[in-house]
Amino acid sequence: GKFLNGLNLDVRPGWQLSILGIFFLMAAYPLVNLSFLVNESIPLPAWADKFESQAEDTLKAILTMNTPVIFIFNLIIIAILPGIGEELIFRGILQKQIGLLFKSPVAAIWISAFIFSAIHLQFEGFLPRMALGAVLGYLYYWTGNLWVPIIAHAFNNGIQVALIYVTGMDISNFD
């Protein structure tokens, strides 16, 4: 209740702002890819490598989509629910509270992006996920509408699930 007050979730952004949010996120993909290359060059200790390997095996199992029903299910659990839930938590609540604490929207965006990435417990995707979190944070800050990063987040995850389903591509680098 208290934390969700002031999020203006009843205010829809309109299709233009939603599309603009998606385009802004897509425009940041080169930065995200660069951060992936930097992240990939950081050596991991053996325990982290093992952890990454287990996480990748789990993701491969989840993203093996043999039927349209499994594809739709994955869109719901990997795109729609995280788009809503993670944005409510990390941008709507955490970023907002950190902003109030530090009196700095930029600090709030980057601290919440760091926590967003850390919570995912994937070392090899840490920097690109943090960059995506920052982009989503800036979308929320600039528009003042939480639906914009929710839609962009769901689109980002959904397009990756759809690409894997349609192409049968290897998901080793799925973030």
What function would you assign to each model-found segment?
Residues 29-45, 86-94, 122, 128:
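Transmembrane alpha-helix/helix-exit interface in multi-pass inner-membrane proteins
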Residues 18-23, 72, 76, 106-111, ...:
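Hydrophobic alpha-helical transmembrane segments
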Residues 117-175:
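Functionally important transmembrane alpha-helices
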Residues 1-8, 91, 96:
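Cytoplasmic membrane-interface regions of multi-pass membrane proteins
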Residues 4-81:
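Juxtamembrane helix-loop-helix connectors linking adjacent transmembrane helices
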Residues 58-70, 105-107, 167-175:
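Aromatic-enriched alpha-helical transmembrane segments of multi-pass intramembrane proteins
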